[in-house]
Amino acid sequence: MNTLPYRLVARLALSAALATTTFTSQAQTAGEPQLNLPRTELRAGMYRIDTQVAARFHERQIGLMHRKSMPQHEGMLFVFEQPGVQCFWMKNTLIPLTAAFVADDGTIVNLADMQPLDEASHCSAKPVRYVLEMNQGWFKSKNIQAGSKISGAPFQPRP
């Protein structure tokens, strides 16, 4: 049996994995925030939210790390391929945030206040596909809580 093709494929796969890890690690250690992600407009009742969309693995992994500030009407929407119990931490995140764990129909399942640089996990109460991070206090100041609805393109019914 010729193992050369298997070894070659294994080495290529390992090289690709290491390159991805290196790219992500360099972005995180460089201390550069992600500022050029695609954007979409969401609404929470009468309130407009300008969100960056982190839909790819490496975008979700970096999230809002290294940001020193964020305008009050802005946030980041994390989009996962499938609903699941999503857990977030605040490694390298310098601003206090609240994570809204959001179901496919836009209903907020639960909220979690998160402190800067805290590496404790904050998880969804049930499987969700979306997590919306906003400045801490934004949801509370607008009386938006679990059961409230977020609307916008990501939450439109799928055919």
Segments from the language model and where they lie:
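Bacterial N-terminal signal peptides that target proteins for export
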Residues: 2-13
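N-terminal signal peptide c-region/cleavage motif recognized by signal peptidases
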Residues: 22-25
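Compact, glycine-rich, soluble single-domain proteins
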Residues: 28-159
